[in-house]
Regions:
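Catalytic-core segments of nucleotide cyclases and related cyclic-nucleotide turnover enzymes
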Residues: 114-139
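Catalytic NTP-binding/metal-coordinating core of nucleotidyl cyclase/transferase enzymes
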Residues: 3-78
Length: 180
């Protein structure tokens, strides 16, 4: 059980906020029955839950083949290891199901507002804030972590990662130098 399970009322906390989804999933399910997709995702959700909860995290929500999870501040290193496990073991699990899908995982660390929210009769834990938005728009073809996540890691976990700096791109100049 995660420390996040004890939050009932809205509060501000610092946490690791990862998003994940599966590459080529929409193509893969195109010629499959809804029942087949449901059975695959049912088993997949259990796999994800087991891995995330083992890292002291919480599955916030699933949306089809995608999801949002959260790890408390004191479990960032365990969370990164869980995400690594999800990438490696999850991709192997997907291959066993004969899917071409792979995990795309992106994570940011920072302040969020979280708690139970929803209709009068159905409230669920959720997280909101710029930290979540940053994680959502990160580019990744595998497992990507922001510098804010990296800074929270111990040296042994840092050694499992390498820095990736994207190539330089050029953009249109507006203003004083645009006429040259």
């Amino acid at each position: 059980m995660s420390d996040l399970d004890n939050i009932d009322r809205a509060e501000g906390v610092d946490l690791l906020a990862p998003f994940f989804d599966l590459t080529t999933f929409s193509i893969y399910v195109r010629n499959r029955s809804a029942q087949d997709v449901f059975e695959l995702l049912s088993d997949y959700y259990q796999l994800v839950g087991d891995i995330i909860e083992e890292g002291n995290g919480k599955v916030v929500k699933f949306i089809g083949d995608a999801g949002l999870v959260a790890f408390p501040e004191d479990a960032v290193a365990k969370g990164v290891l869980a995400l690594r496990k999800l990438k490696n073991e999850g991709d192997a699990w997907l291959a066993d199901w004969d899917t071409p899908c792979k995990h795309r995982i992106k994570a940011h660390f920072g302040h969020v507002h979280c708690g139970r929210i929803g209709t009068r009769t159905s409230k669920q834990f959720d997280v909101f804030g710029e930290t979540v938005n940053i994680a959502a728009v990160l580019q990744s073809n595998g497992l990507a972590l922001t510098a804010q996540v990296f800074r929270k890691l111990d040296s042994s976990t840092r050694q499992l990662l390498k820095k990736h700096t994207p190539p330089i791109t050029y953009i249109l100049v507006e203003g004083a130098h645009a006429d040259q």
